[in-house]
């Protein structure tokens, strides 16, 4: 839960569909190392739905980034060459699916760049920071704490999927928010990833702090 979700969850807009489809794809990538068929269908539905609901660029970025992270995670299976081969095939399939949704968006005229670069003024950047602070509260402090406590696992030769995957989703949504005219609705898609990062902070907190949060 966050303040931003509380504000927008009652509105019947494409942003809620985008939130649902992006969450479905996020689940697919998190579950793919443990299951195959269910996450495969979830990934396809998530990316196609995200594209058709008006966010084809984010669908492409989510898909390609996830494919790279999934490919980099092949070392986690050790010497299991069969599983490594499956991971490589899955990563290629995700990348091709991402490119396929982009072709679909182009054919339907959905891929329209609506980039509005922020002005180099204090009021512009102050408004962006304020949006990040209140919209994602209370997830963002815990998410930052997670990135700090797990920084060695994040910046390591061996990928830590449980940190890198939500960090990628949150980073892409935050960057898209910066150049999007509907910034709050774009930032809405970062909430599942930020909530995931925030959850990993709880085991590192003292018992009194965790009890206070509960």
Over which residues does each language-model region extend?
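Terminal, non-globular segments
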Residues: 1, 33, 94-97
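Multi-pass, polyprenyl lipid-linked donor-dependent membrane glycosyltransferases
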Residues: 1, 7-24
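Generic secondary-structure signature for well-ordered alpha-helical cores
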Residues: 6, 14, 28-34, 134, ...
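Transmembrane-lumen/periplasm boundary regions of multi-pass, lipid-linked membrane glycan transferases
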Residues: 12, 44-186, 190-192, 196, ...
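Specific aromatic-rich, kink-prone transmembrane helix
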Residues: 18-34, 46, 193-197
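Short amphipathic alpha-helical leader/targeting segments
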Residues: 23, 203-204
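Membrane-helix interface segments
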Residues: 35-40
């Amino acid at each position: 839960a966050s303040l931003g979700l509380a504000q927008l969850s009652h509105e019947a807009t494409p942003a809620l569909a985008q939130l649902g489809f992006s969450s479905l794809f996020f689940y697919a990538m998190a579950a793919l190392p443990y299951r195959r068929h269910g996450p495969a269908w979830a990934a396809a539905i998530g990316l196609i739905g995200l594209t058709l609901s008006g966010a084809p660029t984010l669908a492409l970025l989510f898909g390609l980034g996830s494919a790279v992270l999934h490919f980099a995670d092949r070392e986690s299976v050790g010497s299991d060459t069969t599983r490594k081969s499956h991971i490589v095939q899955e990563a290629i399939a995700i990348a091709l699916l991402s490119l396929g949704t982009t072709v679909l968006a182009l054919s339907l005229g959905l891929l329209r760049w609506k980039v509005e670069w922020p002005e180099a003024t204090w009021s512009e950047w102050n408004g962006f920071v304020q949006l990040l602070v209140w919209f994602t509260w209370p997830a963002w402090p815990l998410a930052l704490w997670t990135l700090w406590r797990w920084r060695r696992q994040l910046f390591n030769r061996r990928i830590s999927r449980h940190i890198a995957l939500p960090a990628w989703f949150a980073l892409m949504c935050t960057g898209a928010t910066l150049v999007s005219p509907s910034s709050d609705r774009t930032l809405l898609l970062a909430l599942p990833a930020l909530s995931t990062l925030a959850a990993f902070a709880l085991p590192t907190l003292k018992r009194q702090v965790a009890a206070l949060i509960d």
